[in-house]
Design a protein with these regions (language model features):
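Rossmann-like adenosine-cofactor binding region
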Residues: 147-213, 331-338
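Phosphate/diphosphate ligand-binding glycine-rich loop within oxidoreductases
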Residues: 2-105, 196-198, 208, 217-220
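Adenosine-phosphate binding glycine-rich loop
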Residues: 192-252
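Glycine-rich adenosine-cofactor-binding loop
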Residues: 8, 92-95, 102, 107, ...
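Walker A/P-loop
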Residues: 265
Length: 350
């Protein structure tokens, strides 16, 4: 069996092993490697294929005997293959993945004024793809460049915005790199972040009625391309769509809201059992964190303060994935709770 995986400095939780398990029959593990150990890891011969993530997409290039044309152009490698002679071949599947994400979103790029938020490695990849798709202009927005977050008014006529920054990514959910209401001509929003499923950036797009897409499709599409390189065979494009839909459903929380006494906790427990998911309860979370019952907390602090404690609990639960969440009857009285619960979930009233 081929030995493959994901190389990075700090990886934490990753969906990549689950995606690759759907695509092919090879071992796929996570490899956290310190910068001073990178050369030793790459030359040891201990793997057949490897995805590469930050901060090593450029650092691995000197160890490659050959680069694909796209990797050479972007000077960014996120796929390594060990050839029969032991040398490494470097490729880039991120461009393929982002292009697939754009096509799946239905957002038109040809002839549009586009903004790319962020100036890191992903930014250059996105820039190249947008140009190839015929964007009228592509402007990089960075913190310190000529075009930055302090002069966004220069680009109020932007039609498509792509976020390539980690702003809003788990666990620092709930923040957005820009206020989309500043762009009255906006026609599409793309965010390469995939956890949470809906960042604050795309949640605002949803509220404004602007078409959007999050980064999970890109992750699956680039994994499909990676598997093709690892296996030296074609994989149908339909596999990307299938795996994306499957993961989207599995990752999505089912959130129950309703009047007190409507049976949310009971229904959540039964649903979780039927669907083989974990059942979570915001009231139970509040009580566990504060060492008292909800009734006692309301009596001690008043309802307004209790609702703040409830929102803190909901913020923690809303970051989870693949759960059934029962909420307190009054959670709908605080508007902020909607985004906290919807970022990873579908909300059902019972």
């Amino acid at each position: 069996m081929k030995r493959c995986g994901l190389l990075g400095e700090k990886l934490g939780h990753s969906y990549s092993p689950a995606i690759h398990a759907e695509l092919a029959d090879y071992e796929y593990r996570l490899y956290e490697v310190a910068p001073e150990k990178l050369g030793e890891f790459l030359t040891s011969g201990g793997f057949d294929g490897m995805n590469v993530t930050i901060p090593y997409k450029k650092a691995v290039i000197p160890y490659c005997a050959e680069l694909s044309p796209i990797a050479q152009k972007l000077q960014s490698v996120n796929v390594l293959v060990r050839r029969k002679d032991g040398t490494l071949y470097g490729d880039n599947a991120d461009a393929y993945g982002f292009a697939g994400m754009v096509r799946a979103s239905g957002i038109q790029i040809d002839g549009k004024k586009t903004l790319v938020l962020g100036s890191g490695g992903a930014s250059s990849t996105v820039h190249a793809v947008l140009e190839e798709m015929g964007a009228r202009s592509v402007t990089i927005i960075s913190r310190k460049g000529e075009d930055n977050y302090n002069n966004l008014d220069r680009h109020a006529d932007a039609e498509v915005i792509v976020n390539t920054t980690p702003v809003g990514m788990y666990p620092n959910c709930g923040v957005s790199p820009v206020d989309l209401s500043l762009f009255p001509k906006l026609e599409g929003v793309l965010d390469i972040v995939y956890n949470p499923a809906r960042t604050a950036f795309v949640l605002q797009a949803e509220k404004l009625g602007i078409p959007y897409m999050s980064g999970l499709y890109m992750l699956v599409a680039q994994a499909k391309r990676t598997a093709e390189v690892f296996e030296n065979r074609d994989i149908p494009d339909s596999e990307t769509e299938r795996i994306w839909k499957k993961l989207s459903l599995e990752m999505q929380n089912i959130v129950l809201v309703g009047m007190p006494g409507s049976g949310k906790s009971t229904v959540a427990a039964r649903l979780a059992e039927k669907l083989d998911r974990i059942a979570l309860d915001s009231d139970a979370e509040v009580e566990e964190k504060n060492g008292a019952t909800c009734a006692q907390l309301i009596e001690k602090y008043g309802e307004a303060e209790f609702r703040k404690l409830e929102s803190e609990a909901i913020a923690a639960l809303g970051k989870r994935s693949g759960a059934v969440i029962a909420t307190g009857g009054g959670c709908v009285t605080r508007e902020e709770n909607y985004d906290l619960l919807h970022q990873n979930g579908i909300i059902l009233f019972i």
